């Protein structure tokens, strides 16, 4: 039992460096924005205790109960994430709800990208702004320094972060201990802030401000940004270590710091705007700024890695066109680099920093995408609870009312900042949603067109009855589906008048599981004397590789010798069939994405000297 405990403890330690980076750096700006934003709340005991009570119960209800106890129950072989939750809902829900679950998953993915643009800018700026607290003369240099850090962060992505990644957990452990120490020291001088643990203070605050509470709740949301990382990174560490890290260290440290900032406001007659950095003695200020900068870089890295992982998931689910994906580690499958996503995210982050220029201005843009994702996760959770877990309606309705009601309130509160910057992540999210929706819809249409063509069995029977010249070796034809005759096969017969001794119709089927066991990788059926049908199963966290595929086929008895196997692919050129402006625009956009998508031969790592590509035209 002891080794198991050590393993769980070490995973909990590592989880601090990845999972809790975003939510762990929220004390830098969340509390400050309530009392020192463009629309500050008056500093008095009722307001301070009310806000602290709201933060505490947000941690309990949203993070601890909703995510760590409920949402994380919905997993596929231990993997989590919003697309996983959407996939589980689609598997079990009635047909009308399946498409809704798919669209909700795509929409949440778009909002995650919108949030990912704000997070690095907000986190790094809020840390570097500590320089202006230590040395006010350096205030004009805050933005350039923050931008230099962001440029360096995105520049190293191509090299991978495996070497420096080992320092993430120790740095974040030190960060959380410092948070706790600073907060506890301040609470010692004003222990009355601990009364905010009583929910009566939150209720009193809401009753006191009435409808104006919505505006203030939008700032309280900043304390739980990054909560979706708990679910998304579940596959890397397991839910038990993530829960241990939260309840044993992360949550107590964050609450101590927030309550310490509240104590600071109540004990000083003229508190300054930077409530976090003001907790530290002057001698600690520069080391604290340096530590905060490291912590925000780690938080930003976790978000960037999350975007790479989500992009790969979306590609394998068929929601995004194939892109180049590079593996940056020989030891970890999760260490990947997606150049296109990296460049788009970098440009967007730099634009946001230049547009908003400070964490105070960015606070208005931060939060609305987070609450939108929370709302979607609650809607999907209700579907999963009813149809996957088979919960009875009274239980489902209860969690629906509690969490959808709570998320609706938070979404409404962040919507009050829509015109001050909240439009930006929503706009980015909607753009990503439209791209994914058009790609998925038109790709599905192509599969339907292919399925309506000549049947595979009839075609094979016809070919076996004909007397074609036979070429030596094996020809592999890639097919969209089992019922689809590859265009490359038809063109080879039409123009070359030849067949190979062995012909393999190969289909790649992406499964709603993170990884497929090697024993289940290949399904092989010999359908005639010289034809085989092969289905290759790929998980959404995997990258297809033809060398591995050939090895798996060999294990099942179909030997594909590299020097005797030829791969014949059809390179489609799509044409628009004029049916109306909206239809034509969608098809045109799909065609443009197809032109710039990663070629099948490149994605599968097919050797160029064993490849023949044939151009074909298809009308949509």
From Swiss-Prot:
InterPro entries: K+_transporter, K_trans_C, K_trans_N, Kup
One GO term of the biological process aspect: potassium ion transport
Keywords: Cell inner membrane, Cell membrane, Ion transport, Membrane, Potassium, Potassium transport, Symport, Transmembrane, Transmembrane helix, Transport
Catalytic reaction list: K(+)(in) + H(+)(in) = K(+)(out) + H(+)(out)
Major place of residence: membrane
Membrane topology (UniProt): Multi-pass membrane protein
Keyword Nucleotidyltransferase found: no
MF (Gene Ontology): potassium ion transmembrane transporter activity; symporter activity
Transmembrane segment boundaries: 11-31, 51-71, 100-120, 138-158, 167-187, 202-222, 246-266, 288-308, 334-354, 364-384, 396-416, 418-438
Protein location: Cell inner membrane
Assigned GO CC terms: membrane; plasma membrane
Translocase listed as a keyword: no
Pfam families referenced in this protein's UniProt entry, alphabetically: K_trans, K_trans_C
Function recorded in the entry: Transport of potassium into the cell. Likely operates as a K(+):H(+) symporter.
Family indicated by similarity: Belongs to the HAK/KUP transporter (TC 2.A.72) family.
Protein name: Probable potassium transport system protein Kup
Taxonomic classification: Bacteria, Pseudomonadati, Pseudomonadota, Gammaproteobacteria, Vibrionales
Gene that this polypeptide is encoded by: kup
């Amino acid at each position: 039992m002891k080794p198991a405990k050590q393993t769980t403890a070490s995973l909990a330690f590592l989880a601090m460096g990845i999972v809790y980076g975003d939510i762990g750096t929220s004390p830098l700006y969340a509390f400050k924005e309530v009392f020192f934003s463009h629309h500050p709340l008056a500093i008095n005991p009722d307001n301070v205790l009310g806000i602290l009570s709201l933060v505490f119960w947000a941690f309990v209800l949203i993070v601890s109960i909703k995510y760590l106890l409920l949402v994380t129950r919905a997993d596929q072989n231990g993997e989590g994430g919003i697309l996983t939750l959407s996939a589980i809902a689609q598997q079990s829900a009635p047909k009308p709800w399946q498409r809704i679950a798919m669209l909700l998953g795509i929409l949440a993915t778009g909002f995650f990208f919108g949030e990912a643009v704000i997070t690095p800018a907000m986190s790094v700026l809020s840390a570097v702004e500590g320089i202006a607290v230590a040395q006010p003369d350096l205030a004009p240099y805050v933005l350039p320094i923050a931008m230099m850090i962001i440029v360096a962060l995105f520049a190293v992505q191509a090299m991978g972060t495996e070497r420096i990644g080992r320092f993430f957990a120790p740095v974040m452990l030190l960060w959380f201990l410092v948070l706790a120490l600073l907060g506890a020291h301040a609470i010692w001088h004003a222990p009355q802030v601990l009364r905010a643990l009583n929910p009566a203070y939150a209720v009193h605050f809401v009753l006191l401000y009435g409808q104006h509470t919505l505006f203030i709740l939008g700032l309280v949301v900043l304390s739980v940004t990054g909560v979706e990382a708990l679910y998304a990174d579940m596959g890397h560490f397991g839910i038990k270590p993530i829960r241990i890290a939260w309840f044993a260290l992360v949550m107590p440290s964050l609450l101590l710091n927030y309550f310490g900032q509240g104590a600071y406001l109540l004990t000083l007659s003229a508190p300054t705007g930077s409530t976090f950095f003001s907790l530290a003695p002057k001698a600690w200020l520069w080391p604290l700024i340096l530590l905060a900068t490291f912590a925000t870089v780690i938080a930003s890295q976790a978000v960037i890695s999350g975007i790479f992982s989500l992009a790969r998931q979306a590609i394998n689910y068929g929601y995004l066109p194939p892109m180049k994906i590079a593996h940056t580690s020989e030891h970890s499958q999760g260490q990947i680099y997606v150049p296109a996503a990296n460049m788009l995210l970098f440009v967007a982050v730099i634009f946001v920093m230049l547009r908003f220029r400070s964490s105070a201005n960015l606070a208005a843009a931060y939060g609305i995408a987070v609450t939108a994702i929370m709302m979607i996760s609650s809607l999907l959770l209700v579907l999963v609870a009813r149809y996957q877990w088979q919960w009875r309606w009274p239980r489902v309705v209860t969690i629906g009312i509690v969490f959808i009601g709570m998320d609706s309130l938070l979404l409404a509160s962040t919507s009050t900042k829509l015109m001050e910057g909240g439009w930006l992540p929503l706009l980015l999210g909607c753009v990503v949603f439209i791209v994914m929706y058009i790609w998925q819809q038109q790709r599905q249409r192509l599969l339907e067109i292919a399925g309506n063509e000549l049947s595979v069995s009839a075609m094979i029977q016809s070919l076996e009855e004909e007397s074609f010249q036979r070429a030596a070796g094996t020809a592999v034809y890639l097919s969209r589906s089992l019922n689809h005759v590859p265009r490359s096969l038809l063109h080879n017969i039409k123009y070359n008048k030849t067949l190979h001794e062995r012909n393999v119709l190969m289909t790649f089927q992406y499964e709603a599981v993170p990884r497929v066991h090697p024993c289940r990788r290949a399904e092989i059926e010999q359908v005639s004397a010289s034809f085989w049908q092969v289905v290759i199963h790929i998980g959404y966290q995997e990258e297809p590789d033809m060398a591995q595929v050939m090895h798996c086929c060999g294990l099942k008895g179909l030997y594909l010798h590299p020097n005797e196997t030829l791969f014949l692919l059809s390179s489609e050129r799509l044409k628009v069939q004029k049916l109306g402006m909206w239809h034509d625009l969608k098809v045109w956009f799909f065609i443009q994405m197809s032109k710039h998508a990663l070629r099948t031969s490149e994605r599968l790592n097919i050797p160029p000297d064993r490849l023949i590509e044939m151009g074909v035209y298809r009308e949509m």
